[in-house]
């Protein structure tokens, strides 16, 4: 639902997020040629803490995988992803180009503590074929060319098996 319009160049939408009060979160269209919605959190709204959230479902999404759309509601697997991100040891991997960042795979995790929004850790395969997961990507403005960086954690055998299933 559009709740406002913004912008000096044309008109872009500010929208309510289903199941979220507009005093907590809204989505704004920050795209230029096409819609690109970004979530904005009110400064008085505490940040979502994925480390302590109870997730109910996760979906693997990848532009290039044949099993994109793979879902799980297994509480043990969901807890393993959170524990891996929270407690795992990050590895240093080469940065990812902007073009490569556009095709990154994610795990979309849904929680009743954040209705209408998702926590989306990113995935990649390392040079040695190992699967890695990270909480988020960071844009490195100091590199040439510009690259995405992350704190990459090797995926557990159970997570790797689930991601390769189907």
Regions found by a protein language model. Give the residues of each.
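Function-determining sites in protein domains
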Residues: 1-166
């Amino acid at each position: 639902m559009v709740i406002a319009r913004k912008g000096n160049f044309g008109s872009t939408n500010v929208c309510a997020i289903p199941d979220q009060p507009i005093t907590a979160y809204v989505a704004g269209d920050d795209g230029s040629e096409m819609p690109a919605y970004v979530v904005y959190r009110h400064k008085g709204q505490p940040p979502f803490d994925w480390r302590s959230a109870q997730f109910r479902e996760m979906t693997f999404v990848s532009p290039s995988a044949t099993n994109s759309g793979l879902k799980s509601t297994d509480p043990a697997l969901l807890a393993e992803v959170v524990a891996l991100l929270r407690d795992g040891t990050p590895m240093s991997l080469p940065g990812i180009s902007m073009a490569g960042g556009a095709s990154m795979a994610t795990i979309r995790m849904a929680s009743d503590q954040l209705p209408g929004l998702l926590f989306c850790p990113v995935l990649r395969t390392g040079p040695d074929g190992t699967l890695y997961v990270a909480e988020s990507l960071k844009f490195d403005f100091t590199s040439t060319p510009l690259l995405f960086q992350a704190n990459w954690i090797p995926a557990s055998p159970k997570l790797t098996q689930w991601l390769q299933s189907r």
